């Protein structure tokens, strides 16, 4: 007999979410996650994928994955520290380090795992973490797991960061201090003020930790936000995902050799999870090689991002202050935002609404993710649909 307490909890809370319009219905794709997707037999222009460079369906990555399966099989067969480390994993990590301009790197099974692994391997209850208020959920969870004191500073407010860092240091309560920030903030597309953060960190001896999930492949000619600012030798932890611009799955931490050596013996996701599959490792490595060989996809992504931004702005939409191809269309009211997204969907544009509590109340938006794989014709069609629905609903 199943638990009555659990049944009551689930029924009440699921009903509460549904009554508030916050229950997320998942739409399964019947196609690859490219610029055009198929859901329920209908085709849509896809503006919701983080497959920034279109590499998730690139034939070169497919060939690399298939070749690895033929040589190594479909699974690594063990955790990395027993005998699940393939020469492929070592080559991938060497490639990541070269890509990120660091001494070494370590690969994990997901980007989320990286933040669960790296923060708690270095920080503990005797330490403090200064964290931007808009940092990703995985940073928040990784920080909590470490049991360190979490000190939240106002979003990209360098004076607030400085004052809180000084107070933490002068308190004498903490052995180590770390400042953590996203490189690119995914909801608005703005970029962290890394030069100022590094300056404060050097002044007060803070460890620096940058999660560049949305910056790798996008900024710094593809190498990421840290490289964009020329700070590769100034940031202690460079965190990245292999599932967005890279187009596959997994994550990594890049930094000094002794940091990576420590993570290999102390980060729990590395120690207690089976290694990346051979296919994923091979595809990730090929993807990074492509980015290091040419900026063609990177340049096309930015061209498409500018094109979509200009089109929506000229129509009168509020697209915020994004500094990257991420293009939020800020509607405001939660219900209106969800209805706007629904109408776009009906018109053949798949652009999901993002509302409270993911973003602040009254700042509901439809987040658009143009990619290198979109054609101008696709973007023109999407802009036309935005105009039609926006005027119909009195938004523009």
Curated annotation (Swiss-Prot):
Pfam families hit by this protein: Aminotran_1_2
Domain of life: Bacteria
Subunit description: Homodimer.
Molecular functions per Gene Ontology: pyridoxal phosphate binding; transferase activity
Binding of substrate, residues: 136, 358
Source organism of this protein record: Bacillus cereus (strain ATCC 14579 / DSM 31 / CCUG 7414 / JCM 2152 / NBRC 15305 / NCIMB 9373 / NCTC 2599 / NRRL B-3711)
PANTHER family noted in UniProt: CLASS II AMINOTRANSFERASE/8-AMINO-7-OXONONANOATE SYNTHASE (PTHR13693), LD36009P (PTHR13693:SF3)
Keyword Cell inner membrane included in the entry's annotation: no
Full protein name: Putative pyridoxal phosphate-dependent acyltransferase
The keyword Transferase is annotated on this UniProt entry: yes
Gene3D superfamilies xref list: Aspartate Aminotransferase, domain 1, Type I PLP-dependent aspartate aminotransferase-like (Major domain)
Binding site for pyridoxal 5'-phosphate: 111-112, 186, 211-214, 241-244
GO biological process: biosynthetic process
Entries under InterPro entries matching the protein: Aminotrans_II_pyridoxalP_BS (IPR001917), Aminotransferase_I/II_large (IPR004839), AON_synthase_class-II (IPR050087), AONS_Archaea/Firmicutes (IPR010962), PyrdxlP-dep_Trfase (IPR015424), PyrdxlP-dep_Trfase_major (IPR015421), PyrdxlP-dep_Trfase_small (IPR015422)
Residues found modified as N6-(pyridoxal phosphate)lysine: 244
Family in the record: Belongs to the class-II pyridoxal-phosphate-dependent aminotransferase family.
């Amino acid at each position: 007999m199943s638990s009555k307490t659990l049944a009551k909890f689930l029924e009440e809370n699921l009903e509460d979410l549904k009554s508030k319009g916050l229950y997320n219905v998942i739409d399964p794709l019947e196609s690859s996650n490219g610029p055009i997707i198929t859901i329920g037999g209908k085709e849509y222009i896809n503006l919701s994928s983080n497959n920034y460079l279109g590499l998730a369906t690139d034939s070169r990555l497919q060939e690399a994955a298939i070749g690895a399966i033929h040589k190594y099989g479909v699974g690594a067969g063990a955790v990395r520290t027993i005998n699940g480390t393939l020469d492929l994993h070592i080559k991938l990590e060497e490639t990541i380090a070269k890509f990120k301009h660091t001494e070494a790197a370590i690969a994990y099974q997901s980007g989320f795992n990286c933040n669960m692994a790296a923060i708690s391997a270095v920080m503990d209850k005797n330490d403090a973490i200064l964290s931007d208020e808009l940092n990703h959920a995985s940073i928040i969870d990784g920080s909590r797991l470490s049991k360190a004191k979490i000190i939240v500073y106002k979003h990209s407010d360098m004076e607030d960061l400085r004052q809180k860092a000084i107070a933490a240091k002068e308190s004498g309560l903490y052995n180590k201090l770390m400042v953590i920030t996203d490189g690119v903030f995914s909801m608005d597309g703005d970029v962290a003020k890394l030069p100022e953060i590094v300056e404060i960190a050097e002044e007060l001896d803070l460890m620096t930790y940058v999660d560049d999930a949305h910056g790798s492949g996008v900024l710094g000619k593809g190498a990421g936000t840290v490289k964009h600012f020329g700070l590769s030798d100034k940031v202690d932890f460079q965190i990245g995902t292999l599932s967005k611009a890279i187009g596959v799955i997994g994550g990594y931490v890049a930094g000094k050799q002794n940091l990576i050596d420590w993570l290999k013996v102390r980060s729990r996701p590395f120690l207690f999870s089976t290694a990346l599959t051979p296919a994923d490792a091979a595809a990730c490595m090929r993807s990074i090689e492509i980015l290091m060989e040419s900026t063609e996809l990177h340049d096309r992504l930015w061209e498409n991002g500018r094109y979509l931004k200009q089109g929506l702005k000229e129509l009168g939409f509020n697209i915020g202050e994004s500094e990257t191809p991420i293009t939020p269309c800020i509607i405001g009211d939660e219900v209106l935002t969800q209805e706007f997204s629904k109408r776009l969907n009906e018109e053949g544009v798949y652009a999901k609404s993002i509302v409270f509590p993911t973003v602040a109340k009254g700042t509901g938006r439809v987040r658009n993710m143009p990619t290198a794989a979109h054609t101008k014709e696709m973007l023109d069609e999407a802009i036309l649909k935005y105009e039609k629905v926006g005027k119909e609903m009195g938004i523009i």
